[in-house]
Structure formats: structure tokens, C-alpha cells
Amino acid sequence: MTETAKSEAVAASDIPKGAWVDKYLPARLRPYARIARFDRPIGTWLLLFPGWWSVSLATADWSPGASGVGQTLWFFVLFGIGAAVMRGAGCTFNDISDREFDAKVARTADRPIPSGAVSVRQAIFYLVSLSLIGCLILIQFNPFAIGLGAASLLLVAVYPFMKRITYWPQFFLGLTFNWGALLGWAVVRGDVQAPALILYAGGIFWTLGYD
């Protein structure tokens, strides 16, 4: 790539400049924060909200007492960490899968993998590390919720490739990003019932709207 092409790619890059990543992280850690999109937390919030909504919905008609309230808050914390970590894992997997396409597009050519800031091997190791943290969070829940959470990995694995075969990748993004609507209910109640399914369906349409 020529210097002119590099300059044009940087100018068109979707990586925000001057974010907290640039201000506070050591230079060697910045590419890893960027590949996980920690510099763009909106995606984490969009993944997190359905889970929080579902936990709140599942506990709305309960009177659990002080210990139950503490447990609900703990679920909120676990979902928060889990959303950040698994969104990062999903973005890393997406960038690994799309690295050849990203290298040819000005908007994405400056991303860590196509730019050479992170090798594919390093990205895979990072993906495994994030996934292990996600697993540690998932096993804090009941067996049904653990199985349900693990099932979401199929959607995570499929989504990057849907962009290549359908004009509606947002639908598959909605299926993936709103899985927390099912998981939140399952974490509290140990099953999935109609309110969670309705919330999940609504979340999918919400994703179609914002994406």
C-alpha cells in the first residue's frame, strides 16, 4: 500500500481518534482494545440492555427480600462484564473472519488485523482468552442458563458470514445481540417463558431499526 493510500485509509477509517484508548492505554495494548471495540462501547450497551431488561422482567412480580435483591444486582454485574467481554470476543472473531475483505476497504483497512498491528495468531489467542472469561461468568448461573448461553455461540459463529449471503444480516445480528432477553429470564427462573420470548422478538425488531 502506498503512503497516499495509507493516508486515505486512515482518513476514512472507522476507528475513532482521541478516544480513551489513545489517552490512557499503553501503545501495545491499544490494538487489542480496538479489535474488541472497547473504544466504542455503544455495542456493549446494545448487547447488555436486553439482558438487564429480562432480569428485571423476571423479578418484577417477586418479593425476594434483601438477599434476593443482592442476587439480582449481582446478576446485573455479571451481565455487564459478560456483555463487554463477549462483545469483544464477537468483534474479534468478526475481524478474523473478515480480515481479507477489511484490507480492501478504506473504512476498515486500518483495523488491527489488516493493518498488521495484531497478527491472526495473536487475535485467535485473544479471542480464546475473552471466551474463557465469558465462560467463567456463564458458569455462575443455573444449568439451564448455562446451556442456553452456550447455544448463543452458534449465532456468534454464523453472523459474520451472513453478510456475504444475505441482504438482511441485521436480522441475524438481532438474533445474536438480543439473546440476553432469553438468558436473563433463564438466569432468574431457570426456564424460558412467553414474556422472555416476546421481549426477544421485540429486541430483534429494535435491532433492525437501529442497525
Task: Give the ranges of each region predicted by the language model.
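Intramembrane alpha-helical segments
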Residues: 33-34, 111-195
